[in-house]
Amino acid sequence: LPSLSADAEAPSKIDTAYYNGTKTXXAPVYQYQFGVGXIEXLTYVFKGSQYQDIESPTAYQSK
């Protein structure tokens, strides 16, 4: 995963994240857009010290 730095694009802060209409988090969640290899606009959720792939249905159930 790309490392986050002060000069990275500012994240959009949202209070609640939804996955397929399901509420997944009550704490603030930060979403970052990255372009990695041939895959465009991968979205990661930065929560605490974890990176989670928002496209994964088990992302909010793991760890």
UniProtKB/Swiss-Prot annotation:
Protein name (record): Juvenile hormone esterase, isoform B
**Gene source species:** Trichoplusia ni
| Keyword annotations | Glycoprotein, Hydrolase, Serine esterase
Expressed in which tissues? Fat body, the site of their biosynthesis, and the hemolymph where it is secreted.
Q: Which reaction does it catalyse?
A: juvenile hormone I + H2O = juvenile hormone I carboxylate + methanol + H(+); juvenile hormone III + H2O = juvenile hormone III carboxylate + methanol + H(+)
Disulphide bonds in the chain: none
Give me the glycosylation sites of this protein. Answer: 20
What's its EC?
3.1.1.59
Principal EC category: hydrolase
Family under the similarity heading: Belongs to the type-B carboxylesterase/lipase family.
Query: Which is one GO molecular function term here?
Result: juvenile-hormone esterase activity
Function, as annotated, reads: JH esterase plays a crucial role in the decrease of JH activity in lepidopteran insects, by hydrolyzing the methyl ester of JH. It is also involved in the transport of JH.
**Keyword Hydrolase among record annotations:** yes
